[in-house]
């Protein structure tokens, strides 16, 4: 893909010149450009998680995560089109899991639900959020993912409580 080639058109030589370090310093810290990208992805993931609001609605948590992701939209586009795609997807899933898990565990009904059942709810929401992100990436980030997620969150507000009530989990 052209995104992948854009990432790899940059050579170590270009990177060390732009950063003002020598090649030995680069290779001391990174095996190659993909390992540098992995480190960047890990740092971006940590920053997204770190900047999430503690006490908030699911919509607020999702919005905060997506706004943080949007700050690096161009870089993410190139990484997603590169050989680091699988690694990036795993980090995205980590973000989705964290957003979902912290939200569900903060709900008053979560303590009344069996751990096994709670994990089903978390898994469902996490995978839904991840799927929405992958769809956005596969559409070349061509629509406003923040607004898209706000609409979805409003459409399904209260649905987890209803599921828990329907199956007499609470």
Regions found by a protein language model. Give the residues of each.
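C-terminal peripheral helix-coil segments that are non-catalytic and often amphipathic
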Residues: 135-170
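An amphipathic alpha-helix adjacent to DNA-recognition modules
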Residues: 9-12, 17-20, 27-53, 63-66, ...
């Amino acid at each position: 893909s052209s995104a992948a080639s854009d990432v790899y058109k940059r050579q170590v030589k270009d990177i060390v010149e732009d950063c003002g370090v020598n090649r030995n310093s680069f290779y001391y810290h990174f095996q190659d450009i993909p390992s540098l990208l992995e480190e960047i992805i890990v740092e971006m993931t940590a920053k997204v998680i770190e900047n999430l609001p503690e006490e908030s609605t699911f919509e607020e948590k999702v919005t905060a995560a997506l706004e943080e992701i949007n700050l690096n939209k161009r870089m993410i586009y190139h990484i997603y089109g590169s050989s680091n795609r699988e690694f990036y997807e795993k980090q995205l899933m980590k973000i989705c899991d964290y957003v979902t898990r912290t939200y569900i565990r903060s709900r008053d009904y979560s303590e009344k639900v069996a751990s096994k059942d709670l994990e089903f709810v978390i898994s469902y929401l996490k995978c839904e959020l991840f799927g929405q992100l992958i769809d956005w990436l596969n559409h070349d980030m061509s629509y406003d993912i923040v607004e898209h997620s706000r609409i979805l969150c409003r459409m399904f507000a209260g649905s987890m409580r209803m599921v828990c009530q329907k199956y007499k989990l609470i």
